[in-house]
Design a protein with these regions (language model features):
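N-terminal export/targeting leaders of redox proteins
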Residues: 1-45, 92, 96, 209-214, ...
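Extracytoplasmic c-type cytochrome modules immediately beyond a signal peptide or single-pass transmembrane anchor
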Residues: 23-26, 55, 68-76, 84-137
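Electrostatic cytochrome c docking/interface patches
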Residues: 29-55, 67-68, 73, 120-142, ...
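The canonical Cys-X-X-Cys-His
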Residues: 58-64, 119, 142-153, 203
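Tandem repeat domain/solenoid detector
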Residues: 60, 125, 159, 197, ...
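Generic structural signal for alpha-helix termini and adjacent loop/cap motifs
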Residues: 64, 96-97, 125-129, 151, ...
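Gly/Gly-Pro-rich "capping" loops immediately C-terminal to redox-active cysteine motifs
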Residues: 65-94, 105-109, 144-146, 153-179, ...
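Interaction-mediating elements
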Residues: 101, 118-121, 185, 197-198, ...
């Protein structure tokens, strides 16, 4: 499939979006605010049924509860309840090289913008609804996270990922990639570079235990016609 022209993600700085943000800061205080995110380009209207067909192979990993893949081994992310707009942005990142992941690049390199919008809508399902309440006090390293990802881990805007109930080891891996350049996002690199391994572990542990939680996308069919 050819790439669509309506969504020129690479023309917009991923750093400005903070779209892949697992927004964390160690040296900043809770009173400080997160960097403002630019408004991303409009995405195509989604066709969920087409998204179901597009994601047929995706569920080979994302449809198995607790499944781990890639090297080093870590859990593939929970997608059910995630923001579809964020998922589409993430897919663009894998396709266009802003996220280094061989498997995900191979899965997305032939997808058009429309394909990714459709796939994201199907995989996300109904987004999580925020309770508006924090579960205890976030660790110091995560104080700034809640400004984008919510006090209960439910993102405050659809361009950000919700983190509530996400696999702990996946959050650790994502932060490590932002810190070391596996994900090209200058805003997140700035945040993650200030975190020690212990800080990253604390952030991941906190968000992974929050509810309402993301879930594994179910695999309701084995053939495209079902």
């Amino acid at each position: 499939m050819g790439r669509g022209r309506g969504f020129k993600l690479r023309a917009v700085s991923i750093a400005a979006l903070a779209a892949g943000a697992l927004a964390v800061a160690h040296t900043q205080t809770p009173a400080e605010t997160a960097p403002a995110a630019a408004t991303p380009p409009a995405q195509p209207a989604a066709d969920v049924q087409h998204g179901k067909a597009v994601t047929y192979t995706c569920l080979g990993c994302h449809g198995i509860e607790g499944y781990k893949n890639a090297y080093p081994m870590y859990s593939v992310p929970e997608l059910r309840g995630q923001n579809a707009e964020y998922l589409a942005i993430a897919l663009h990142g894998y396709r266009d090289g802003d996220r280094a992941h061989i498997t995900m690049h191979s899965q997305t390199e032939t997808l058009s913008d429309q394909d990714m919008a459709d796939a994201a809508a199907f995989l996300a399902g109904k987004p999580l609804v925020s309770s508006g309440k924090a579960a205890g006090t976030p660790p110091q390293a995560a104080q700034l996270c809640v400004s984008c990802h919510g006090p209960d881990g439910v993102a405050v805007a659809p361009i950000y990922p919700s983190l509530a109930g996400q696999h702990e080891d996946y959050i650790v891996r994502a932060l490590d990639e932002y810190k070391h350049g596996g994900r090209k996002n200058l805003v997140m690199k700035q945040f993650a570079s200030n975190l020690s391994d212990a800080d990253i572990a604390a952030v991941a542990a906190y968000f992974s235990r929050l509810t309402p939680a993301l879930e594994t996308e179910p695999r309701p069919y084995t053939r495209l016609g079902e």
